[in-house]
Amino acid sequence: MTQPIKLLVGLANPGPEYAKTRHNAGAWVVEELARVHNVTLKNEPKFFGLTGRIMVNGQDLRLLIPTTFMNLSGKAIAALAKFYQIKPEEIMVAHDELDLLPGVAKFKKGGGHGGHNGLRDTISKLGNNKDFYRLRIGIGHPGHKDKVAGFVLGKAPAKEQELLDAAADESVRCLDILIKDGLSKAQNRLHTFKAE
């Protein structure tokens, strides 16, 4: 990996009513990473989000969960990245992914937004730069595009939530590998994982 990751973002909608909805799966990864490292995320109004800072394998990693609504996520990411002079290719955005099943997660470098409003705004606010990393947390698909909005804003049943949590936990372990050993090794581990 040529660039180290300096910022991990978990996309979410703000407020307790959204906390356990599928659309907030990206934020669960950041929350779990903060918990593992015993760091409390603090509200930082100038960055429009909850922020923290940890060390992973001797490397500084900033954490961010935007407190804007999902479709304005890029505002928070761009504000923090500009302040700390973090380039798009040093950012990883964790987000829910309709095209992957619950219990599955994958790393990806670059690409489009795939209809995800949080990614769409992030690309836009980073000057149409798509070169950031993504951590895609599978939530499954409701089967028809007209059902997507209600599905992502809904809460998963208990068994499905266990799969989502397991994928988020494994993602946290694989982030350590990514930072220490690079993308391909982390992909080899994460992409063969499937919670049952």
Curated annotation (Swiss-Prot):
Could you tell me the keywords of this UniProt record?
Answer: Cytoplasm, Hydrolase, RNA-binding, tRNA-binding
Q: Which of the seven top EC classes does this enzyme belong to?
A: hydrolase
Q: Which CDD domains match?
A: PTH
Binding-site residues for tRNA, renumbered to this chain: 18, 69, 71, 117
Cell location = Cytoplasm
Q: Name one GO molecular function term.
A: peptidyl-tRNA hydrolase activity
Q: What is its EC number?
A: 3.1.1.29
Where exactly is the site Stabilizes the basic form of H active site to accept a proton? 96
Q: Where does this chain mainly localize?
A: cytoplasm
Spell out the catalytic residues: 23 (proton acceptor)
Q: Could you tell me the superkingdom of the organism this chain comes from?
A: Bacteria
Report the catalytic activity.
an N-acyl-L-alpha-aminoacyl-tRNA + H2O = an N-acyl-L-amino acid + a tRNA + H(+)
Q: Where is this site: Discriminates between blocked and unblocked aminoacyl-tRNA?
A: 13
UniProt subunit comment: Monomer.
For this entry, the protein name equals Peptidyl-tRNA hydrolase
Species for this entry: Vibrio campbellii (strain ATCC BAA-1116)
